[in-house]
């Protein structure tokens, strides 16, 4: 049956043929408009990748993963990736964005977008059951969307889905839901894979997933001990099939073992064969990469990313309410030095905008130079001729963030900044990450340039900063341009809007970002089927042990 194409696909194909967009950008945008990945890949002149042969996989065994085991209550409130890497084996998402930033249907069979991008039809996969035997259906989807949009839940999804309200979600049938958007949005399918976007069982969920861990995923929870371990057990009736035609997953069990945030014991454990896989989603992996990159007993998979470490300043608190002070501190970042010493040069320099050169919308912009004398002058103009004492909060488990802070402290001194670095355990930093006036926060990879701005640099319908707006920076012109960009499909027109967005954030924004990082997935050789993902998400249903 021939796929029904969105009206914009023809124009996208024309732009691709004229060289106005890359092959990857073409595949990405056409799949967002509902074209299957196989069809989009064929249109781009490529062969669709083949799956593993049935004879190459082996069933059974236990995978041991070193990962923090945090307290888990409401999935919509997740602000760490590591608990989602455990819970995503139990509950699932409507879509899946792969390591190449291509978005596929998952619990959805497919989707269609209207020509104006304001009506999205979500067709649910049939025959899927939660692990307690309940059918997965449209009631689960409507219930979960309403959880995301409930201000009392406090989910970051509410800010990302600002184009929706409770009246926007229509149940058409047991397996179809329509979204009626207030304004156009191209990235809806990508938003549905934001890591707090796990689908919930509307019959059993009452706010605490561990108390009622019913999901559609390939595993069930056998043991969950905060700070110790999470043990997952294979379910036998999972909906998805493996290369051998039988129900996934291949493994019998997965054990996530909390080894703290010190990298040394984890490196020793994987070298000794006590651990099979290292989860770096919430801890920096540079030390392990340096120690293990030449080790013949492990696989090191690398991914370039849009992930960064953000020097963030709360604009509702002095002295950061004065843009001259913010600009002064940003000028104290010696970016080349910070990247080289904090992250071994494994990444790209940042430009104080939360849009990466890897984002398809990115508009090339000058990288600010280290200029402590200009910074000193700005401080004097702001009323601090004798300099300024500030506290900088950082999580001690991110070694590259600690080094970033130490280099900044040294290089900001000539400008008059006297920085007191306040280190604390990562868990303590996450408890207050939106509250400290000055800190360095890790921000995960997002495939499209509008996603983080929608999460972190806008206000809600009343102008109040959204849940993840840790700096409280809300700029009317920036917000209006972002809304415009969200509804613009033409890549060149979208990039022109981003030129304005980036200029505003660089000149009067609330963050510095010295670098974008590469990431690694490290596993023992017997672990097969692991794929590098720029967000460090772990999809383990089709992983096996040789």
PLM region spans:
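Detector for C-terminal structural segments
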Residues: 29-50, 225-229, 234, 301, ...
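Gly/Pro-rich hinge or "lid" segments in bacterial periplasmic/extracellular proteins
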Residues: 72, 98-102, 192-255, 264, ...
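N-terminal lobe/hinge region of extracytoplasmic solute-binding protein
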Residues: 66-115, 146, 214
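Aromatic- and charge-enriched surface segment that lines or borders ligand/interaction sites
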Residues: 109-154, 172, 178, 269, ...
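N-terminal secretory signal peptides
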Residues: 1-25, 50-51
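Structural transition elements
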Residues: 219, 346-381, 396-403
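Ligand-site clamp/hinge motif
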Residues: 239-288, 418-420
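Surface-exposed binding/hinge segments that line
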Residues: 123, 157-202, 218-225
């Amino acid at each position: 049956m021939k796929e029904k194409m969105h009206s914009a696909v023809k124009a996208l194909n024309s732009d691709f043929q004229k060289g106005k967009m890359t092959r990857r950008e073409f595949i990405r945008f056409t799949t967002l408009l509902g074209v299957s990945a196989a069809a989009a890949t064929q249109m781009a002149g490529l062969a669709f990748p083949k799956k593993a042969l049935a004879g190459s996989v082996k069933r059974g065994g236990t995978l041991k993963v070193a990962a923090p085991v945090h307290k888990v209550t409401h999935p919509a409130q997740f602000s760490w990736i590591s608990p989602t890497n455990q819970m995503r084996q139990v509950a699932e998402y409507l879509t899946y964005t792969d390591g190449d930033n291509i978005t596929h249907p998952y619990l959805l069979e497919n989707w269609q977008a209207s020509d104006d991008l304001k009506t999205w039809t979500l067709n649910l996969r049939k025959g899927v059951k939660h692990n307690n035997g309940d059918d997965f259906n449209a009631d689960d989807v409507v219930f979960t969307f309403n959880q995301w949009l409930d201000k009392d839940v406090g989910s970051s999804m509410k800010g990302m889905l600002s184009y929706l309200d409770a009246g926007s979600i229509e149940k058409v049938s047991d397996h179809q839901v329509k979204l009626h958007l207030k304004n156009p949005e191209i990235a809806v399918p990508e938003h549905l894979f934001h890591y707090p976007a796990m689908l919930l069982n509307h019959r059993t969920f009452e706010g605490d997933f561990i108390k009622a861990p019913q999901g559609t995923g390939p595993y069930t929870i056998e043991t969950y001990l905060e700070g110790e371990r999470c043990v997952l057990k294979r379910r036998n009736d999972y909906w998805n099939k493996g290369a051998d035609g039988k129900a996934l997953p291949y493994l019998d069990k997965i054990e996530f073992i909390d080894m703290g945030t010190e990298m040394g014991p984890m490196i020793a454990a994987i070298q000794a064969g006590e651990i099979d896989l290292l989860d770096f989603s919430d801890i920096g992996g540079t030390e392990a990469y340096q120690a293990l990159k030449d080790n013949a007993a492990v696989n090191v998979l690398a991914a370039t990313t849009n992930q960064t470490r953000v020097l963030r300043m709360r604009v509702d608190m002095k002295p950061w309410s004065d843009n001259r002070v913010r600009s002064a501190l940003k000028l104290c970042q010696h970016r080349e030095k910070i990247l080289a010493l904090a992250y071994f040069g494994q990444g790209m320099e940042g430009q104080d905008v939360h849009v990466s050169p890897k984002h398809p919308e990115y508009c090339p912009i000058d990288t600010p130079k280290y200029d402590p004398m200009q910074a000193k002058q700005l401080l004097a103009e702001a009323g601090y001729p004798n300099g300024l004492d500030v506290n900088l909060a950082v999580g001690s488990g991110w070694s590259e963030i600690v080094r970033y802070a130490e280099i900044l402290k040294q290089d900001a001194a000539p400008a008059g900044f006297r920085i007191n670095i306040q280190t604390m355990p990562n868990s303590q930093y996450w408890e207050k990450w939106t509250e400290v006036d000055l800190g360095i926060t890790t921000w995960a990879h997002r495939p499209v340039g509008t996603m983080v701005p929608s999460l972190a640099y806008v206000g809600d319908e009343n102008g109040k900063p959204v849940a993840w707006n840790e700096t409280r920076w809300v700029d009317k012109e920036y917000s209006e341009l972002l809304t415009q960009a969200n509804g613009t499909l033409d890549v060149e027109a979208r990039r022109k809007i981003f030129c304005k967005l980036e200029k505003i954030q660089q000149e009067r924004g609330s963050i510095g970002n010295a670098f974008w990082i590469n990431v690694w997935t490290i596993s023992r050789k017997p672990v097969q089927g692991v794929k590098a993902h720029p967000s460090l998400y772990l999809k383990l249903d089709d992983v096996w042990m040789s």
